[in-house]
């Protein structure tokens, strides 16, 4: 041994290396340590799933909101339309479904008269001008022209003009008064009693008064129209006319076997005889003539004025009824008494008066014809 070894005996001793320092990470014995790539995968999957779920919820919410808004808008529009329809129900219907005019039978029931010009009184120039022209076509009335008068307001129009107007409107085109065929004139120029002639007080007193209607039996009516007095002048100041009021009474007419052609019917006026011949129909709905005779102061009849009247020709049944009534009239005419003397009837007015005897028959209500028909009869002095 060397002296050095002897001096330091610990130099030959070999010391082991120090152990490494302990790591800071703690590993659980239950869950073993995994790699970093395996840890990042669940985080990305959760993030993607969350984003997709959020987008789906947003899209669903927007779709729901849009549908609700559209439904609310449609409901609002429907409510507005319903309110407007409740306030004005005519707006939702077409004109074909809502008929605001009068029926053909109601239009034909409006009285017709013959226009007569008169002298204009001072201070009534404007009223006379308005009463001598039609407010629908703005044409002046001609002498002896047939016109139609509205019973409610006494305004006068051409027959064709007012008929077309009343098909779409139920009021007067001049004053907008509602038209009703049941209305009567203010002064009651025409009043037909329903009682028989023998029970009527006018038949007992044969002195006829102007503006009265003498009713015999239910087959005919005699109308006496005289000159208007001072009280009547205010109502009829616009026109001087002969008023015809259609008054239909329901009587059964025996049809029987009628000929196919209309035979001429004699019309008696005193000692003279006239014959009514067949006339060609200018219109499909026109058939039948009537006459009005003028009675002078001496009680004799003067000029004969024919008047055209219309009946319904909608079906062949009306034609057969017409022929049957013509035959019935010719049979009954021999038994109808004369309705008064000329001398007695001319004593009331002091002036010219007009007498007309007409026969009113009602064909009754049928499915093919809605309006009643008026047929002519003989005129007797």
Swiss-Prot record:
Does this entry carry the keyword Protein biosynthesis? no
Q: Which domain of life is it from?
A: Eukaryota
CDD domains xrefs: RING-H2_EL5-like (cd16461)
Against InterPro entries, the record matches this protein to: ATL1/ATL16-like (IPR044600), Znf_RING (IPR001841), Znf_RING/FYVE/PHD (IPR013083)
Query: Which parts pass through the membrane?
Result: 46-66
Compartments, as annotated in UniProt: Membrane
Annotated keywords: Membrane, Metal-binding, Transferase, Transmembrane, Transmembrane helix, Ubl conjugation pathway, Zinc, Zinc-finger
This enzyme catalyses: S-ubiquitinyl-[E2 ubiquitin-conjugating enzyme]-L-cysteine + [acceptor protein]-L-lysine = [E2 ubiquitin-conjugating enzyme]-L-cysteine + N(6)-ubiquitinyl-[acceptor protein]-L-lysine
Please give the residue ranges the record annotates as the region Disordered: 1-31, 249-269, 334-354
EC number(s) stated in the UniProt entry for this protein: 2.3.2.27
How is this protein positioned relative to the membrane?
Single-pass membrane protein
Which ranges are annotated Polar residues under compositional bias? 250-261
Q: Please give the SMART domains that the UniProt record associates with this protein.
A: RING
**Domain remark from Swiss-Prot or TrEMBL:** The RING-type zinc finger domain mediates binding to an E2 ubiquitin-conjugating enzyme.
The protein's name: RING-H2 finger protein ATL1
Species for this entry? Arabidopsis thaliana
